[in-house]
Each structure stands twice: as C-alpha cells, then as structure tokens.
C-alpha cells in the first residue's frame, strides 16, 4: 500500500493511493498515518479495505509529510561507500548516528526556507525507514519485522552550521522545512529489496545525485538492529539511512542552494519530491 496525508499544514488527513493513482480519503477509518496505524495490526486493518469504497479526494490538494507525529527522526551519516569516498573520509566501523529535530519535517513539495545567515544549504536524497513495531535489543533476524515501510527523505543540511559551528551535526540539520518526507509511505511488503533501489536528485534540471542503495555501508536490517541496541524505537519513528554521492558540498567547486532554485528527487518505487528554495522571510 501507499499511505499518505493531504491537506493544509497542521490539518492533514490520512489517505491511500489506489492502483489508478487516485487519492482515497481514509479519515473515516483511521485518525492519521501515525503511531498505532503503522503497527502490523493497523496496516492489516487498512489492507482489508476495498479502496473503491473510500471517497476520492478531488483536485490537487497539498501533500503533507507521509507520517504524522513522528517521535524520532534518526539519521545515519557517511552510510554510502561512494559518498564517503567523495568526502575523502574512511568508512565508519559502525553506523554514525545523529538526530534531526522533528520540527524540521514538512511535506514533499513544500518550499524549503533557507535559514537566516546561511550560505551553505545543501541537499541529500535518502531512503527513510518507517518503524511499525516497538523495538528494543532486537536480534538481527528480528529487525525487518519491525519495519512498516519506506519513504523518500530529503535531509536538507546547512554545512556551515553543521561543520563549522562546533558541536554536533544537529545544528545544521534541524531548521524548519529541512526534513521533507513523502509523498507516501510504501509498505514493506511492496518493496522487494530495499538494498536495490535507485535514488536521484536534481537542481534546476541538472542531476547531481544518481545512486543506488546497493552501496550502503550498513543496510536496512543492520541499522534497525543496531539502533535498537542504543534506544527504543516506536511506531512512527523514521530512520534516514544516508545519501549517495553528489551533494553540493562534494562538487568542485562546491554548490549550494540559492533562493528560487528547484530541487527534484526520488527513489525507485517510492515516489518523487519537488521543492523550491526561498528566503527565510519570504
């Protein structure tokens, strides 16, 4: 299934995308695409519904973040071998983790606001793992049972805030609008192999990122297992699994977002995003 949320910011309603690409309103069935809805029982309940019995959403509504009330947005750094090579850094011996403020989350096509004082706002297309079952100290072979599905994440990053301002990376990762997710969450059963997905990103029509999840250093199952040893995971938590090469910081010369530019990005089978960069005060 493809589950999504539509409507104005703060007033999103749950929906699914049917086989014909029509948005079907789920608000008469579930409160939101969040928390208990993402559990195996919640997804089974939605899966038993005939999509044709649900109201069609007319027009072209705003698409919101595909998961509501995200408890944790956990990110993995340097998790693509070719991206680490681009950055001139050794492969990490275990996953590099950092948190991204959930207040950064926005819809997949919302404008990206460049923070005040920013000169190095950058892009990162990433595969997002949506947790569907509470997890603590998982055995490796249990990890995938705790995954509800997958989504596209753009891990927008302000490199000067992240790298040059001392402290942790969260400084450059957490501005409002720095976490577009969606357009929808695709349930785990519809993604045959999360380690064989193409992902790409372009700016103003020029493709900068064109990679595959095959080059991940640590795969989906390992990440879920590993993180569960360090913190509990709850339904609706999202893990952003790292980015392939082609970020602006890695260009020669470096390139960063300016006001009025258009980012387009996507992951094979998971949909596409489209964002315009604007001034913070626009």
Predicted regions and their residues:
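Structural signature of FAD isoalloxazine-binding scaffolds in flavoprotein oxidoreductases
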Residues: 90-108, 121-123, 258-269
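A generic local secondary-structure boundary/capping motif
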Residues: 63-65, 86-88, 112-121, 127, ...
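N-terminal non-catalytic cap/leader segment that marks the start of a structured domain
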Residues: 1-95, 192, 207, 281
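Catalytic-pocket segment enriched in acidic/His residues
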Residues: 5, 9-10, 53-58, 62, ...
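RNA pseudouridine synthases
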Residues: 131-133, 138-153
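Residues embedded in well-ordered beta-strands
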Residues: 14, 126-130, 151, 200
